Amino acid sequence: MVNTNIRPDEISSSIRKEIEGYTQEVKVVNVGTVLQVGDGIARIYGLDKVMAGELVEFEDGTVGIALNSESDNVGAVLMGDGLTIQEGSSVKATGKIAQIPVSDAYLGRVVNALAQPIDGKGQIPASESRPIESPAPGIISRRSVYEPMQTGLIAIDSMIPIGRGQRELIIGDRQTGKTAVATDTILNQKGQNVICVYVAIGQKASSVAQVVNTFEERGAMEYTIVVAEAANSPATLQYLAPYTGAALAEYFMYRKQHTLIIYDDLSKQAQAYRQMSLLLRRPPGREAYPGDVFYLHSRLLERAAKSSSQLGEGSMTASPIVETQAGDVSAYIPTNVISITDGQIFLSADSFNAGIRPAINVGISVSRVGSAAQIKAMKQVAGKLKLELAQFAELEAFAQFASDLDKATQNQLARGQRLRELLKQSQSAPLAVEEQVATIYTGVNGFSDKLKVEQVKRFLVQLREYITTNKPQFGEIIRSTKMFTEQAENILKEAIEEHIELFLLQEK
């Protein structure tokens, strides 16, 4: 028989212990209800105290961002497809804003807009995080741009130089080689101690894979992070991708390193933002873009900077890409981004189709930093180049109507055609600065005038090889002194004269 002798004092003491151990903890959660969901947008009732840009979490685990606070509901954009979110389900405010983990381990990886790996190489270890949207450096924490960011493309480094901490727009129609200019610049940073971030927004996954492939083949992934949101990604993630890229680049910039970030391209980000805004029923403005589309891009591009010496002189150079329709630079997004950036590289479809590649229109491309972002050697040889090309373009237009031209004009036209050849380069073949100096010197000083126009490009390729193998001291002088000294000029003249004889003999 079971002993049923229960002692009341034992019961009361155990109850007393339970009561003493009880902590009255009230957890306040801001909860709302889904009124409507669809097209990547959710309207939520409740959530009274939600902040603009705060993350909200749905019952199925989907995360959204609260963007619209109206009198009776909150409009949130979803960071997923939202197919399993049901009307009437609950939503809770997280009290956080969008943040991403950051670390050196991101180098060589392909991630999405939430900094999650999408390259199948496993998780990325990270000990700290940064907000996706962070304020741009103030005036005191910046200094003026003075170091060159070499792109490896003669046309840019000689006439439209880019400096570390500058924002240089690459603009042109589709299929004019905008991405090629950007990727060549990344390839040229090998060994320059520059961290590169390539942000692909709303592109075909195959195009992104091709770019990543090129980087891997050329060993550029060692210092590059790729942030990709393909065309089939939700608009919210396409809109966030550039800010994620900027946050990753800032992590390195504030650690006294130099970074280069490419946004490919901001037209697609603006379209994703327009889609979100229209679905949130925000009033449309010009070209149906919302009123704050300028702020969308200005707050992104203002994060590029050259840090002051107190902050360690790190830098973040931004190259946004914008696509134009039929060369119309006066559309809304192109004019906005032109006014925010420190210059633009304009790629023309006509030049591209005429076989001038990179198809840079030197006439209307500018760099508002200018020669401050060039080494002395480049300033010395490239000074006359832009002027000569501009005069040639003017003469060429005139020569179409005139039949008999005097000898001086014919010579100027011949020189101009050869200078145009000198600017042509193959894709993924960036040139070191000493090779560029040698190439420009050859053209500007008339050494290539003896050659036929179609021989110029081949001659210059061989000349660069000849100098590298037979006159290595030329490259050493330019690299060490950053100046085009008299000694360097004599070595170069000698090399050109020797090689021109060889070349003309071979061609016969």
From Swiss-Prot:
EC number: 7.1.2.2
Keyword DNA damage included in the entry's annotation: no
Lineage: Eukaryota, Viridiplantae, Streptophyta, Embryophyta, Tracheophyta
Major localisation: plastid
Quaternary data: F-type ATPases have 2 components, CF(1) - the catalytic core - and CF(0) - the membrane proton channel. CF(1) has five subunits: alpha(3), beta(3), gamma(1), delta(1), epsilon(1). CF(0) has four main subunits: a, b, b' and c.
Catalytic activity, reaction form: ATP + H2O + 4 H(+)(in) = ADP + phosphate + 5 H(+)(out)
Disulfide bond entries: none
Residues carrying the site annotation Required for activity: 365
The name this protein goes by in its record: ATP synthase subunit alpha, chloroplastic
Keywords, ordered alphabetically: ATP synthesis, ATP-binding, CF(1), Chloroplast, Hydrogen ion transport, Ion transport, Membrane, Nucleotide-binding, Plastid, Thylakoid, Translocase, Transport
UniProt record similarity statement: Belongs to the ATPase alpha/beta chains family.
Job description of the protein: Produces ATP from ADP in the presence of a proton gradient across the membrane. The alpha chain is a regulatory subunit.
Classification via InterPro entries: ATP_synth_asu-like_sf, ATP_synth_asu_C, ATP_synth_asu_C_sf, ATP_synth_F1_a_nt-bd_dom, ATP_synth_F1_asu, ATPase_a/bsu_AS, ATPase_F1/V1/A1_a/bsu_N, ATPase_F1/V1/A1_a/bsu_N_sf
Membrane topology, record value: Peripheral membrane protein
GO cellular component: chloroplast thylakoid membrane; proton-transporting ATP synthase complex
Compartments where located: Plastid, Chloroplast thylakoid membrane
PROSITE patterns, sorted: ATPASE_ALPHA_BETA (PS00152)
Binding site for ATP: 172-179
Any one Gene Ontology molecular-function term assigned to this protein's record: ATP binding
